Every structure is written in structure tokens, then in C-alpha cells.
Amino acid sequence: MPVQQHGLLVLDKPSGPSSAQCISKVKRLGQKKIGHAGTLDPMAGGVLLVLLGHATKISGHLMADGEKVYAGTLRLGETTDTWDAEGTVTATAPWHHVTEADVRAIVDSWLGSSEQEVPPYSAAKHQGQPLYKLSRAGRETPVKTKTVEISLAEVVWCDLPHVRFRVRCSSGTYIRSLAHSLGIRLGCGAVLTELTREYSHPFGLDMAHTLDAVLAEPGRLAERVIPITHALPHWPKVGISLQQEASVRNGIPLPYQPEMVADMPFMEGVKAILLDTREVPVALVETAIVGGRQVWAVLRGLWS
């Protein structure tokens, strides 16, 4: 039985296979527990954070903390049911009236907080069913929106009807929706034709390994795995004793002691990673007041 890994593998997902298919291939290397943070559509490539072993338990915190950077290409003049080039064309329209200045003005307007329409072909759920299943069954899908935050929006190049752009956005932003809404505002339709995730907090493509390389060299998996402590870089690391570890494993909150965190004064809501005497992650914790006492409350245990 191969040694089980506990950490993150930053994968450079190729365009074509689904995120689940990529995860399945890595699992065949002998890893029992495996997951990922932030699905990429089959058409999209780039950074996919693969979670191994105990790291599968930090997925929600990675997603909550992390912004993402995408570079994409769109094409004016048509609309599809999926809002990308892989869908069925539902409408075409002339685009020659559109200028580069028109495109740049709309991309600039993406900045800030806004309500974004969720694509009808997506994993978002309605009454427990993913929208894509309702769409494939020919059933009407409700219009759903979500709040997204975009801190960078730029046109990389414009060779109409093709436009290359880059955005830095909050987790869960649909880039297909940005392309679709741009097409509506220009009056000609638009579809996403290519997408690369360049960054998924806290890792970029410079840290990523191709799927082919990972599968071709299974003996190097361990050296490619990033420790859990590095996945949450802004969380304080708090060392605990064997006795304290026993309490944590029983779900008992630990008394807060400032000297455990470089004499940091107590503040509610501070998240940290507890490390055992070997500096192995034991649990994710958060400062809280329980029964009038200042404590580290266990959010998630990082053990089997």
C-alpha cells in the first residue's frame, strides 16, 4: 500500500477532462482520501487544488479565504445554451458595430461588487437538483443570482470578434456569466472560448504540476505535495503539548494563552492551526468565548 499523503497537490489541469476525471486519475496512484477545492469546467485549464488525506477537511476554508485569477478569451456574435463555445448555438447576431472602446468600457464596469446571473448549465442547485440536470432534461431553470467581487478586470488584447481578458475575483465567480453579460450589453451575444485559472489562493501556475507529469512519476508524488500549514499561510500556527492534544481530540476547547501566539491579545474569531509536538497539524481552531472563558474552539480535527 502506497504511503498516504496529507497536503495539497497544485495541478495544472488540462483542457478537456472534467475536474472529477483528473482527481480520479490521481487517486489511482494509491491515495485513498482525495478531493479538490474549486471545480473547473472541462473546457477550462489551469490551477486545480487537489486535497490529499487530512487536507480534504480544509476545503471549505480554502474556498472561503481564496480569490482567483482567470485569463479568458471570448468571441462576439453568438449565444449558446451553456454560455461557452461547447454549447448549442441558440442565436447569432452581427457584431461589426462593436468597437474596442465599447468592449473596454464594459470590462472596466465589471470592477467591484455586483449580482451575477448563474449559468443555466451549472452545478448550482434548485430544490436539491443541479441546474445542469434540469437543463439537460429540458426543464425550465429558474434565474439565480449571486454576489461576486471583482478586484481586477482588464482587456489583454482585442482582435474583434475575439477578446482576451483577465479578472481577479471572489471564489465562485462564473467567468461564462461575464462573457454572456458582455454579449447582451453589446447587443450581439458572446461566448467564452477558452479559460485558464492562473491563481487559486494561495497558489499560482508557477507552483503547478501537469497531470501527465504527476501520473508519469508516481514516485515523486510526496515531494510535490505541499503541507497543510502552507495552504493557510495567514493562519497562526500554535504548538500544543501531548496533554493538550488529547483534550483537542476529545473536542474540549483549549484555554487561550497569549504566549502561545507570540503574545497576541485575545480577539474573537481568529483562526489558527494547532500543531503537535512533531509540528504535525492536529486541528483547525478559532478563538471564542465559551462559558465566559477565552478559548481555542475546535473547528475541524485533522486526524483519521
Swiss-Prot record:
Q: Where is the active site?
A: D41
Per its record, the protein catalyses: uridine(55) in tRNA = pseudouridine(55) in tRNA
Q: What is its EC number?
A: 5.4.99.25
Q: Where is the signal peptide?
A: none
One annotated GO molecular function is:
tRNA pseudouridine(55) synthase activity
Top-level taxonomic group: Bacteria
EC class name = isomerase
GO BP term (any one): tRNA pseudouridine synthesis
Q: Which SUPFAM superfamilies match?
A: Pseudouridine synthase (SSF55120)
The record's listing under CDD domains reads:
PseudoU_synth_EcTruB (cd02573)
- InterPro entries, alphabetized: PsdUridine_synth_cat_dom_sf, PsdUridine_synth_N, tRNA_psdUridine_synth_TruB
Ranges in coiled-coil conformation: none
Keyword entries, A-Z = Isomerase, tRNA processing
Q: Which HAMAP family match?
A: TruB_bact (MF_01080)
Function noted in UniProt? Responsible for synthesis of pseudouridine from uracil-55 in the psi GC loop of transfer RNAs.
The entry assigns this protein to a family as follows: Belongs to the pseudouridine synthase TruB family. Type 1 subfamily.
Protein name as it appears in the record: tRNA pseudouridine synthase B
Organism of origin is Nitratidesulfovibrio vulgaris (strain ATCC 29579 / DSM 644 / CCUG 34227 / NCIMB 8303 / VKM B-1760 / Hildenborough) (Desulfovibrio vulgaris)
